[in-house]
């Protein structure tokens, strides 16, 4: 029996390239090193959150949500991509960001604003969860239909993006000419924060 996965909206530029870092491998004495270029997923300058958002935005649509609410650091890549997805698919967007708003927005914060996101600055990180929930509850009380995008897009739904990324990686067969059993990497190393990539 084939498992049934939740729907997703396809907007990432996939598959992302798998590039060998030959000079670095040579410098380190011979291991073959590859980098999976998920900086090239395409949404708002790319990044790994796009894979998660394909599933999360589909879930928000399925629930007839009107606004996406999420949070993170003041220069969060996740929030930048959430704001971009909201703009692309017609959602309102509220972002609860930790830190003080600068006089002049730049980098991701500037992009958040260009994508039309409403920014709520929270000076102390320990207050962020409470304020995020208050914004969500207020939207519900006003008769709106909010969808809470978890930090980093990390939830069982969002993690599916990286379950499928592993399938994609295995199909790319980086070790040309090797036996199928030898075609998998010995190690996979990545930066992590909210755990969704690990879970996938």
Question: Where do the PLM segments sit?
Answer:
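PLP-dependent amino-acid enzyme catalytic core
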Residues: 1-200
């Amino acid at each position: 029996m084939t498992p049934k996965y939740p729907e997703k909206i396809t907007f990432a530029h996939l598959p992302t390239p798998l590039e060998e870092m030959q000079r670095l491998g040579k410098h380190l004495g011979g291991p073959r090193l590859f980098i999976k270029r998920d900086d090239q997923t395409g949404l708002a300058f790319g990044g790994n959150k796009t894979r998660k958002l394909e599933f999360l935005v589909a879930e928000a649509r399925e629930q007839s949500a009107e606004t996406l609410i999420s949070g993170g650091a003041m220069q969060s890549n996740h929030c930048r991509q959430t704001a971009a997805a909201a703009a692309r698919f017609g959602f309102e967007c509220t972002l609860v960001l930790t830190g003080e708003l600068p006089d002049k927005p730049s980098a991701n914060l500037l992009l958040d604003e260009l994508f039309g996101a409403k920014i709520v600055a929270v000076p102390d990180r320990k207050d962020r969860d409470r304020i995020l929930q208050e914004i969500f509850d207020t939207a519900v009380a006003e008769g709106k239909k909010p969808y809470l995008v978890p930090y980093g897009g990390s939830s069982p739904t969002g993690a599916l993006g990286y379950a499928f990324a592993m399938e994609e990686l295995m199909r790319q067969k980086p070790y040309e000419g090797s036996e199928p059993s030898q075609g998998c990497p010995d190690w996979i190393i990545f930066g992590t924060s909210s755990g969704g990539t690990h879970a996938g």
